[in-house]
């Protein structure tokens, strides 16, 4: 369920954060909030899909491609681009994928994070 904003209020853009490691999830959430966005944090690709199916207000997915589960990071990226084409993608991982695998309107931010790069990407896509 999406939170209702008071009449006349400008809601913050919503960013779905996918990260299975709690400490990294907290860091990623902090980056989203620093970008003046609302963070919705999930721990699995399957939970990310369920969240996207249930919400229409998500503008950006900030996802770790190394999350454990039955759906790999790049398969999730392809699914998001196919089912929710307007959603922008900020992707991360310990190892950079083949950059040709990153879809248009997507960016890869490697670890360790460069805070300014991540926040700028989120702000740019959420605007």
Q: What residues fall within each predicted segment?
A:
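Non-catalytic signal-transmission and effector/linker regions of two-component phosphorelay proteins
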Residues: 1-16, 22-23, 57, 82, ...
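Two-component/phosphorelay signaling modules centered on CheY-like receiver
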Residues: 22-40
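Acidic, metal-coordinating helix/loop segments flanking the phosphotransfer/catalytic sites
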Residues: 41-60
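Conserved phosphotransfer microenvironments
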Residues: 64-78
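Hydrophobic/aromatic residues positioned on beta-strands within the core alpha/beta folds
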Residues: 92-93
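Short loop/helix-cap segments at secondary-structure boundaries that form the rim of catalytic
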Residues: 96-105
């Amino acid at each position: 369920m999406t939170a209702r904003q008071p009449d006349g209020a400008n809601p913050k853009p919503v960013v779905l954060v996918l990260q299975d490691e709690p400490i990294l999830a907290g860091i990623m959430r902090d980056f989203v909030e620093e970008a003046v966005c609302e963070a919705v944090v999930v721990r699995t690709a399957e939970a990310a899909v369920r969240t996207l199916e249930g919400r229409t207000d998500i503008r950006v997915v900030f996802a770790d491609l190394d999350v454990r589960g039955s759906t790999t990071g790049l398969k999730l990226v392809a699914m998001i681009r196919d089912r929710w084409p307007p959603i922008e993608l900020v992707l991360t991982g310990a190892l950079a994928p083949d950059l040709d695998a990153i879809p248009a309107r997507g960016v890869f931010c490697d670890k360790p994070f460069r805070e300014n790069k991540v926040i700028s990407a989120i702000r740019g896509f959420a605007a």
